[in-house]
Design a protein with these regions (language model features):
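Bacterial N-terminal signal peptides
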Residues: 37-46
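Hydrophilic extracytoplasmic domains
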Residues: 277-365
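N-terminal secretory signal peptides that target proteins for export/translocation
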Residues: 1-28
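A short, surface-exposed interaction/processing loop segment used at functional sites
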Residues: 142-180, 214-259, 337-365
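Sec-dependent signal peptide cleavage junction
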Residues: 47-59
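Exposed beta-strand-loop-beta-strand "reactive/processing" segments of non-cytosolic proteins
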Residues: 105-148, 190-215
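Short, non-transmembrane alpha-helical segments in secretory-pathway proteins
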Residues: 65-121, 159-188, 240-306
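ATP-dependent carboxylate-amine ligase
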Residues: 4, 34-36
Length: 365
């Protein structure tokens, strides 16, 4: 397996320009950013934790006097090569083992020769986004979270060309909301941070304004209350999911997924039907065996945080070889991302008890 390890320190993005690389002012800002990064990396040679500390900083607000031409999407080669060492070895091993297991089965077989790129997720680097590319083309992603015991868990993974936290949709949303000037710049002192709350979320803080939350997939504005509704509880994060640990080893079964990708908004008759009961991951799996397409609707005001309502079209089972009955298996359910070719896989326990399940009407059942 060929891995090109990139470590992106742009978990926190600051007020500045979204101009393209051909703009001379943007190029000058990239040069300044590269020099700054070089200084950070030089410091890391003296103290290896310097880069890791910089990446784990959850919120560094750009001063009002900062250069307004600062690029939000600096992707210089010096960043790629110099700071990859900040990715913990334990995370690398867990990710590589996970990708190896997935690549043994369709539709993940292209991942066998994939390149992996790592980006920390805030606050406090409690998560990592790992993007998967093959010959420069996006193939999928993994989101890995830190557990309370210091290990790692597989919080989510996905297959397809639409990746979380893509800058393009975010740029369009900020412009549509009138938050950027004609040159694509945010007000000085602005802060953009990647968050994971059960779904990818951009947290946008602007001077003298309420914090905005924007979907990390489709750039839809989310209600503020949704962030708390979907926030992961780290105390129970390792239950019923693929987890790293010296006593753990996991084997992925071939996923069972229907070809049909129903959209809950195309046929709302499911709203008039009775909800189904799933009190555990195994019960949810049995529902999917009986009804190939279900719809999940979150309870309360948590729909936006989960990205719900959404369809469930299958599952993938992971078997533990740790010998522990409590960790015998983990079930991840398949969720087609609307209007894309991407399918998300979420741990079944994340949904059980957090909403209701309905049978999707139509040909799939």
């Amino acid at each position: 397996m060929i891995h090109l390890l990139h470590w992106h320190k742009n978990n926190v993005l600051h007020g500045g320009s979204f101009n393209n690389e051909n703009d001379s002012r943007s190029n000058r800002s990239r040069a300044r950013s590269a020099l700054l990064l070089a200084a950070i990396c030089t410091a890391a040679l003296i103290h290896p934790l310097a880069v890791a500390a910089a990446g784990s900083e959850a919120a560094i607000i750009t001063p009002a006097s900062a250069d307004p031409s600062l690029s939000l999407a600096d992707d210089s080669s010096i960043r790629k090569s110099a700071v990859s060492a900040a990715v913990p070895q334990s995370l690398l091993h867990f990710t590589e083992d996970t990708v190896e297991q997935l690549s043994a089965h369709v539709p993940f077989t292209a991942w066998s020769e994939a390149e992996l790129e790592y980006t920390p997720l805030g606050p406090g680097t409690h998560g990592w986004l790992v993007t998967v590319t093959d010959e420069g083309l996006p193939q999928g992603y993994l989101i890995i979270s830190a557990s309370e015991d210091g290990g790692y868990v597989l919080s989510e993974y996905g297959i397809g060309g639409t990746l979380p936290f893509s800058l393009g949709p975010l740029e369009q949303r900020l412009a549509a909301e009138g938050l950027t000037d004609p040159e694509g710049s945010l007000p000085q002192g602005s802060l953009i941070r990647k968050r994971y709350t059960g779904a990818p979320v951009w947290e946008v803080t602007l001077p003298n304004q309420d914090t905005l939350y924007i979907s990390g997939f489709n750039s839809e504005l989310l209600p503020n209350v949704s962030l708390a509704s979907g926030t992961l509880d780290r105390s129970g994060i390792s239950k019923g999911v693929v987890a790293a640990g010296s006593a753990h080893g996991w084997s992925a079964d071939a996923p069972s997924i229907t070809e049909h990708r129903p959209d809950p908004y195309d046929n709302l008759q499911w709203l008039t039907s009775s909800s189904l009961t799933a009190r555990s991951s195994s019960e949810l799996r049995r529902l999917l065996q009986k009804h190939p397409s279900l719809v999940f609707k979150s309870k309360g005001d948590g729909n936006a945080a989960f990205g719900a309502p959404f369809s469930l079209t299958g599952w993938q089972r992971w078997s533990s070889v740790s010998g522990s009955a409590a960790d015998a298996a983990a079930i991840y359910v398949a969720i087609p991302l609307r209007n894309t070719d991407t399918t998300r896989f979420l741990p079944a326990p994340r949904l059980v008890g957090q909403g209701k399940f309905y049978v999707y009407p139509g040909k799939s059942n």
